[in-house]
């Protein structure tokens, strides 16, 4: 985990003492810089904790969704019948129409 890789805490940075020499760093400048680092470090730590909580929450929600999905009863897929042409009625209608047309065109000559 990332927590194992972090070696310093904000408190460690705050309490760090630097040795000063005759021509060493200006102590005030180092303190100001360390204060900025501490603030950033605390902000990163806070963000990290929030992300860990969010990650745990999302994992729980995912597990709940998986569990709910397995518990949903499987409903059979109902296929709607495809409209099939009705040949019997169509053929009968065509034959009747043809007969009527023949009677109209040829009259009674056809049936004599």
From Swiss-Prot:
GO cellular component terms, semicolon-separated: cytoplasm
UniProt keywords, alphabetically: Cell cycle, Cell division, Cell shape, Coiled coil, Cytoplasm
Matching Gene3D superfamilies: 6.10.250.660
UniProt-listed GO biological process terms: cell division; regulation of cell shape
Subcellular location, record wording: Cytoplasm
Keyword Cytoplasm (UniProt): yes
Principal location listed in the UniProt entry: cytoplasm
Pfam families assigned: DivIVA
Coiled coil (UniProt feature): 38-72
Family designation: Belongs to the GpsB family.
Subunit comment: Forms polymers through the coiled coil domains. Interacts with PBP1, MreC and EzrA.
Function: Divisome component that associates with the complex late in its assembly, after the Z-ring is formed, and is dependent on DivIC and PBP2B for its recruitment to the divisome. Together with EzrA, is a key component of the system that regulates PBP1 localization during cell cycle progression. Its main role could be the removal of PBP1 from the cell pole after pole maturation is completed. Also contributes to the recruitment of PBP1 to the division complex. Not essential for septum formation.
Descriptive protein name: Cell cycle protein GpsB
Species name: Bacillus anthracis
Gene for this chain: gpsB
């Amino acid at each position: 985990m990332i927590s194992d890789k972090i070696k310093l805490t904000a408190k460690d940075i705050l309490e760090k003492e630097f040795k000063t020499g005759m021509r060493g760093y200006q102590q005030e400048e180092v303190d100001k810089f360390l204060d900025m680092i501490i603030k950033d470090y605390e902000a990163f730590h806070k963000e990290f904790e929030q992300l860990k909580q969010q990650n745990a929450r999302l994992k729980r929600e995912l597990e709940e969704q998986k569990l709910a999905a397995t518990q949903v009863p499987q409903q059979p897929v109902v296929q709607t019948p495809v409209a099939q042409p009705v040949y019997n009625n169509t053929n009968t209608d065509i034959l009747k129409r043809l007969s009527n047309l023949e009677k109209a065109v040829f009259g009674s000559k056809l049936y004599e």
